[in-house]
Amino acid sequence: MNEFLPDSCLLGVMLAVSSHSGPQVIYHYPPSNRILETARDAHMNQQLGTTGLKRETEGRSMKSRGHPGNWDMNSELDSDLHSSKMERTASSSSSSSLSSPSSGLSDSELSTDYADWSTSGSSSDSELDLQTPDDSRRSQLENAGARSTRNVSPVSMSRNTSLGREPKDNGQKISASKLLDILNDPKSQFTKINTNDTNDDQFNMEEDDDLIEFDYMTSEKRVDITEEFFTEANYQDTSKFFEFDIDFLAELCCPSREMCNTRFELTVDEYCFLGHPIHVDSSGNWRKSRKRNNSLSKSKRSGSLTGSRKRSGSKSSNHDKSFSAETPNSPESSKIIEEVGSLHKSRTLSNPQNDHFTKDMTMFHVCFIMDPNLIEYNKRVDDMYQYVVARLSVLLRYLQSKNDYVSEQCELILKEKEKVFKNSKHYKSLSLPSEKGRYLYQRLLAKSSLARALTECVEKIKKNEIACLEITDHRTVSLQIPIQNEFSILPQYKLYPVLKGSFLTSIQNNKFLEKSANIDDNHHAKSARDTNLISDHVNTFSNGQTKNEIFYSKNMENALTAQNDYDDDDLLLYSILLLDDPDKIIADLDNYSSNDDIGGVILKQLVKVIQPNVPLLSYQYIINELLAEKPLSSSTTANKSKQNKDNKTNTFYSALLRSCALHLIYWRHARAILPISFKNTYIVSPLSPVEADNSEMIKGNRKPSITDLNVTSNSSSKIPVIYLNQQSFKLKFPSLPSLPTFLNILSLGKPKAFGNIIPSKEHKPIYMAALIWLIQKGYLTQLLTFVYIRVDKKIKMKVDEDLEKEGFRTNRRRRQEDNVDNKLLSTDENANEPPKSTKVDINDNTLEGRDTEYDSDSFDYDDPEFNHDYTIILEPERATALEKRWIYKCIQDQPQDIKILFNKVMKYMNGRTAMETVMLKEHISRHDIKRLLTSLGNYIVELNHW
């Protein structure tokens, strides 16, 4: 059982939609044959002898559930069948490539638009060198459209193609509408040569345009696919997805409305289909708007931002207008643009039914395919749904309700498929199915932002990395499955493997992220009053804030509320420990934020100056300097309005610092720890990577992936990590003892403060750097102090005596009152009775009443706890009346300053809150805490734990 090891068990993703014409699969990834992949993966695992992980082939191979030995015959048989299939496909493709000299079309191209698109032809992927068009044609088109290609976003550029359906046959085909355009050309009635030249120019123009755009997207690194999926051995026909027909999966993953808008989980054989299908309601809305007026106003504002992209959509022929606006006004370029625009216009008008695709779509479903082990099934599937599936589906539903994003992207993908299958000469020139498939997927990824997002999501999550998906130009979402690399309780790592180098500490970083997520759900109304302040600052300081998800106004509202509701454990009281070099972290921040983003600027500056021995709250001056504002005024002479403004600004700066820290923690760049000090006590962690090798080690404790966990065949991978780190430690700190010796010094004798091993003051800087390095690598963990209140039998007896004294005085008053009442209410029937017996009855009734009163006050002397020699108070803040008397009796004879200090700290003496944390929360010095614990003496129980 490997629950603690990072393994998403993710295989692929599929986008299925349902419209009036029925369900269909729009996009799926990867197009790979899983049997061949798992056979190679099993062989690799058998060769390397790995037991902890099943996914150790550079993060791209998929694990096998069967025995490695059973795959040899099946994989060989499947390889033979696949190779024979490719030979038949290649021969048919080569035979169909002969075109007629009269019309430029082969017999197989004379087809109709009503071909079955649901079962696609075999298009494969392998290593492919893209063939560029002639230099003359390329230079001619670059003069006309290179500038437009650079400036127009890939989504807006790709919405001008026509919707098409994937043909069933493998041969080259051309749609009937395109054939009619050629035959109806007036020039074709007079001269056959002019007709061929004109149409060839149009097709070449379109092909050049697509290739230039594709080259641009490749240079911008927006097209990134795994080459292993597109080899001849691993490639699988696009009509199948993990051994299932596409039509079958379309019916399977498009449930009825009653089963939509909730969790979708279906197991077929060893595969688990997990998703969250989104269906329109009875009124045709994708989601219910809580505030219709606000949503309408927001939609108007968003319409102004996305209007240019929508106006350049596929429903009109405005592509040539926007294209020509960015190009020089030369006759040659204008002629080329007119030809391209007319071709796009004719293709768009030839398929009028495509314009209704957006209105016809009633459901979409992003379905992920997994293969978890049976013993880990619940955990793997639940984590995948909670952290990836649900969040991505909700975001796509929001975008679909706002601007029909999903339906437009689906239409765009279908159009691009038809364009590649019917019009791409480069696609037809390829012989192998794997090469065709690779080219097809590259074109789809270059055109569709949704296809890129789904592909990147699969690639990153499979490698246990963070997937930063740029859905649109204004929407970015980060998805990840958190790795288990921190523990508050020592796990049974011999039975259940864990990542070596994990952190063993009570300071759990996940709780800060969970609190931020809980604020999203529970405190929208409470933070609404600060929305105007936040929006004003964001609009003033940042124009590119959408490039970084942590600086959305929504998250800033949440950060403002965190200090009010979680003041007992504020993130600003902790320090930030960077887990990698600052230069690498800044380089990563540059990839996901723009230069003018105020959030990115603050983050970069914070990474440069941050130190793990300084609380995060001390870095507020960075924001003041970057925003060029004067220090906040706190003078008593300032008026009330100015003080309120300063308080709001200070709250905003604190929220911004908190957001920066959460960003670094979420992206695994840093950890929140207690400020490092020489007065703290540090011990060697039981989870330190002393006996681990490279396969069990988190490299730098940063962004672990399957690549990091991979075991190579080199002998160096089996060397314990401590010997590898010993060299780095020696190079970094040459004047210190070796790493094993240094750890041995910390392990000898009783744990003591780290400053006791420093020989002199001159050695403090280098010892501080060594301490930070050891904590980064997971070798050391801080030993914390936890306290319980202990009440012994003497305190209980004193409290018992006090209660008896108070109870005696109460009985005396009640006895007198009862005597008076009984004398007034005496009857003739009781007049003959002696007074003595009357007193006895009164006393008995009084005692019963006293017992009843004390029972109501929870003073139960028959409680077994009362008779024990001592009692530990687990919750001092919620102690009973009797327990409170015990507690205050313990400090009755203490000085007044000790009593005041005890009242501050008493609620934290529950055995769960470290005294080192109390020092930060209550601003109490270490000396005062030590004096308090010494004064209480035997009345406390002190525990040392991580």
Curated annotation (Swiss-Prot):
Any GO BP annotation: meiotic cell cycle
Q: Keywords for this entry?
A: Meiosis, Signal
Q: Where is the composition biased (Low complexity)?
A: 91-125
Q: List GO terms (cellular component aspect).
A: GATOR1 complex
Q: Where is the composition biased (Polar residues)?
A: 146-163, 324-333
The source's superkingdom equals Eukaryota
Q: Where is this region: Disordered?
A: 48-171, 283-334, 813-849
- Renumbered to this chain, the Basic and acidic residues biased-composition regions fall at 79-88, 836-849
Its biological purpose: Mediates inactivation of the TORC1 complex in response to amino acid starvation. Required for meiotic nuclear division.
Which family does the record claim for this protein? Belongs to the NPR3 family.
Q: What is this protein called?
A: Nitrogen permease regulator 3
